């Protein structure tokens, strides 16, 4: 099977450190040497990320102390949720200093030899929060993913160049076609989900998106032989 990109999903970081963007030293004691081996074989490297910051990390403490995470509407500090992992906070991409803080950390990942990012999530955005620039949380629910992917894509353009910058993004809104490529999220391995995926791709094409992808044979459960074929 032809292969051009090798992807590291969430466990390139230590479990429940999603996301502090630190390689798990137990699994990758010399990540630069590891990624060089892949590059020497002509492969590009993709790493999984999201905009949620685990409360048990130094990165969370730094973000909370500097006001880089979305705040509670009642003024009692960082808004947190257990949707993905316990007590995570969300980066406030309306704060230019928070964008720089977040992308500077991603820059260290690129420096290790990573070429692009899978920008997961971005759609589970609360409406009972306060943004740095005073944005309406209801309006920001869909726009958040635009700012998230814009920040990451802009970094990739700066570091990798206009013709090499690419994402593998999960969530989107109007205008997100400027930050390709998107995929259809976590579809199930059954015929109804396959039909939904095809309809989603056609909708994307009609909405100005030139590129899209999906999970081969579905993500949830295992496809039957007939479905896989």
Language-model features, listed with the residues they occupy:
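Catalytic-domain carbohydrate-binding cleft regions of carbohydrate-active enzymes
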Residues: 1-229
